[in-house]
């Protein structure tokens, strides 16, 4: 993958750049991602978020290696609850999901749909498959983890150490709780 990857929402008004290699490329099968994915893809003009088995593809990057180059004022956040520790950020202009951010997290889980198929990083693992009604439908092309693995957490820790234990803030104008 290129060291600088230009990404954009469907209409091009919000543009981001991801620099360097991703921390990991995962498909999340957790209940929250499936619920949020269904909500996001039901919005007007929104692209499909969920895969055929309810999974959401994320390309995880360090926050300090993702820049919002245009359209910052168009960012909107969706939270599944007012007390939720995560938010999904989308481009308000066209309802393209951009990233999932955890409160206090040092990384962004960028939605895989932002990459053209031809250059999208390959999936390395599926997480939280225990939340699926029937995990046996998943292909066995990558590890299907019941939760998350030590390797997954080790990658996150390595990135956080490299960042000097910082967790940059990303301001988003609109915040919606559902």
Regions of interest found by a model, annotated:
Residues 1-8, 14-178:
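A short Gly-Trp-Pro
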